[in-house]
């Protein structure tokens, strides 16, 4: 859990993802299309990916990918991110943490 805290607090936007997950691809594409440069951890490619996935599950993330942290705070998965985007809360949130300047 401490490793997860360190990974998410050092960058303004962190996405935990898997290459094989279509929803992960959708969320990554959304942020890239907005002009944000997220830090992306592909859990199926990195060392200790399974361990990190278990830590995400302990935080209540289900499914465990994609999971988004903005400004070190857990936002949630694809449903939460898309809801924020549709109600126009996502961009102000990204601006507040310095992940988006325009």
From Swiss-Prot:
Gene Ontology CC entries for this record: cytoplasm; nucleus
Pfam families: Glutaredoxin
Entry keyword set: 2Fe-2S, Cytoplasm, Iron, Iron-sulfur, Metal-binding, Nucleus, Redox-active center
Subcellular location: Cytoplasm; Nucleus
Alphabetized Gene3D superfamilies for the sequence: Glutaredoxin (3.40.30.10)
Glutaredoxin domain ranges (all copies): 1-101
Keyword hit for Iron-sulfur: yes
Residues holding [2Fe-2S] cluster: 21
InterPro entries with a match to the protein in the record: GlrX-like_pln_2, Glutaredoxin, Glutaredoxin_subgr, Thioredoxin-like_sf
GO molecular function per UniProt: 2 iron, 2 sulfur cluster binding; metal ion binding
Span(s) of short sequence motif Responsive for interaction with TGA factors: 99-102
UniProt cross-references to SUPFAM superfamilies, sorted A to Z: Thioredoxin-like (SSF52833)
Role according to the record: May only reduce GSH-thiol disulfides, but not protein disulfides.
Annotated family: Belongs to the glutaredoxin family. CC-type subfamily.
The protein's name in its UniProt record: Monothiol glutaredoxin-S7
């Amino acid at each position: 859990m401490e490793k997860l805290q360190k990974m998410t607090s050092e960058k303004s936007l962190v996405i935990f993802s898997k290459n094989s997950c279509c929803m992960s691809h959708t969320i990554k594409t959304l942020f890239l299309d907005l002009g944000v440069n997220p830090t992306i951890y592909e859990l199926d490619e990195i060392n200790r990916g399974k361990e990190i996935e278990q830590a995400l599950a302990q935080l209540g993330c289900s499914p465990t990918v994609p999971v988004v942290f903005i400004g070190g705070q857990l936002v949630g998965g694809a449903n939460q991110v898309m809801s924020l985007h549709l109600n126009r809360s996502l961009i102000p949130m990204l601006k507040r943490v310095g992940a988006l300047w325009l």
